[in-house]
């Protein structure tokens, strides 16, 4: 995004600490997102459809720390004049990266919504890598179309006498800014909030269904059925009059009669054993079903909680800047008031690129395992070297 060079030339006592803080902030953004990218490269188990979208988010946020902030530091602190070419490159790149980060959050939220609300169809889909890459590329194309053409077209609207400020030509056109803020902030917030509400609603319905007697009656019915079969087998085995008579007159029966008695006894014993096995199978299946449902509910709650945190961080980091930008656009370019709060709101957007890796990827167990795997790989050469020295 853009902020006019309103600070002027600061004294050296303030320039050096601020430059150090800004550079450290950019470096922290790069490190946090680089860990996510490296984890995706190292661990093949992370190459799942939803994790590709986290990779896309990490790439956009990483480039914010690599390009947007480093170019901005000398401009805002040391009054370095970009020049028209570098200024245009910085504006398009910064707007593109920030908007792509926002749209990646929307794509991640939609994917999580599909995995919870339509779990069966989501798992049945075998999305190819080309389709996933197409969705990732579509995010970047849409992000460019939101601001890129307007930045290029409005370059001629700038006042030629003021060449120190690197900002788009439409910053004083409130209606254009309103449309762009609608596309890059308000609609994404509404979309992510909608997906999050739908996830909570789906979890609530699933939980209510699991507590419903008709749903829970499966295990009871199966248990009673197995008990009935078991009792029937025992009754057939103990109350058969033919068996009692055969036992009483076993010395007077022919060998053929004895063999038929043994066959009948063996048949009843097998039926009782079969009934017992069926009852045990039904009970184990019911317990496994309840465990799977409980695991799905826990997974859905975790996803919903992570999306709620992701949405809250995005709204907090972007809302102040959008509000300030629209309000300041109503002033003429040369009469806009200078405000420290606007500078803070401006940096909050980039702060969102810093917190994104810690909101979901680095808190996910698979990403954590991949992170420790990276550390083990880096420590392994040093360990082998120490062993060779000791030997």
Swiss-Prot record:
Domain of life: Eukaryota
Entry-linked SUPFAM superfamilies: Family A G protein-coupled receptor-like
Chain ranges on the Cytoplasmic side, renumbered to this chain: 41-52, 109-131, 196-306, 365-391
Gene Ontology CC annotation, any one: plasma membrane
Region (Disordered) residue spans: 238-258
GO molecular function, one term: histamine receptor activity
Signal peptide range: none
Compositionally biased spans, kind Basic and acidic residues: 247-256
Disulfide cross-links: 87-166
Membrane protein topology class: Multi-pass membrane protein
Keywords recorded for this protein, A-Z: Cell membrane, Disulfide bond, G-protein coupled receptor, Glycoprotein, Membrane, Receptor, Transducer, Transmembrane, Transmembrane helix
Annotated family: Belongs to the G-protein coupled receptor 1 family.
Role summary: The H4 subclass of histamine receptors could mediate the histamine signals in peripheral tissues. Displays a significant level of constitutive activity (spontaneous activity in the absence of agonist).
Subunit details: Interacts with TSPAN4.
Name of the protein in its database record: Histamine H4 receptor
Record lineage: Eukaryota, Metazoa, Chordata, Craniata, Vertebrata
Gene: Hrh4
């Amino acid at each position: 995004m853009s902020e006019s060079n309103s600070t002027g030339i600061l004294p050296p006592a303030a320039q050096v600490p601020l430059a150090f803080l800004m550079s450290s902030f950019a470096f922290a953004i790069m490190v946090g997102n680089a860990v996510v990218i490296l984890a995706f490269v190292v661990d093949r188990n992370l190459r799942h459809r939803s994790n590709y979208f986290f990779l896309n988010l990490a790439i956009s946020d990483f480039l914010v720390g690599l390009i947007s902030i480093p170019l901005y530091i000398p401009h805002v602190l040391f009054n370095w004049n970009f020049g028209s070419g570098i200024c245009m490159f910085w504006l398009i790149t910064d707007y593109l990266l920030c908007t792509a980060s926002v749209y990646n959050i929307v794509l991640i939220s939609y994917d999580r919504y599909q995995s919870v609300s339509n779990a069966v169809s989501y798992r049945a889909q075998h999305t190819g890598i080309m389709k996933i890459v197409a969705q990732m590329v579509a995010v970047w194309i849409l992000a460019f179309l939101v601001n890129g053409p307007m930045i290029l077209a409005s370059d001629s609207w700038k006042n030629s006498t003021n060449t120190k400020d690197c900002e788009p030509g439409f910053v004083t056109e409130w209606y254009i800014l309103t449309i762009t803020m609608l596309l890059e902030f308000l609609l994404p917030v509404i979309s992510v909030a909608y997906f999050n509400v739908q996830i909570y609603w789906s979890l609530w319905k699933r939980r209510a269904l699991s507590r419903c007697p008709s749903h829970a009656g499966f295990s009871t019915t199966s248990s009673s059925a197995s008990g009935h079969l078991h009792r029937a087998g025992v009754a057939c085995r103990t109350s058969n009059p033919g068996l009692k008579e055969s036992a009483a007159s076993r010395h007077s029966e022919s060998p053929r009669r004895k063999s038929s008695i043994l066959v009948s006894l063996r048949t009843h014993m097998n039926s009782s054993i079969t009934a017992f096995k069926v009852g045990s199978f039904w009970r184990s299946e019911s317990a496994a079903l309840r465990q799977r449902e409980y695991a799905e509910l826990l997974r859905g709650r975790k996803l919903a909680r992570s999306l709620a945190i992701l949405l809250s961080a995005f709204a907090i980091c972007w809302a102040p800047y959008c509000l300030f930008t629209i309000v300041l656009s109503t002033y003429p370019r040369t009469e806009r008031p200078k405000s420290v709060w606007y500078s803070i709101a401006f940096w909050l957007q980039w702060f969102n690129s810093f917190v994104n890796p810690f909101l979901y990827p680095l808190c996910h167990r698979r990403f954590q395992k991949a992170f420790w795997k990276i550390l083990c790989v880096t420590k392994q050469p040093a360990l082998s070297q120490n062993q060779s020295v000791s030997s």
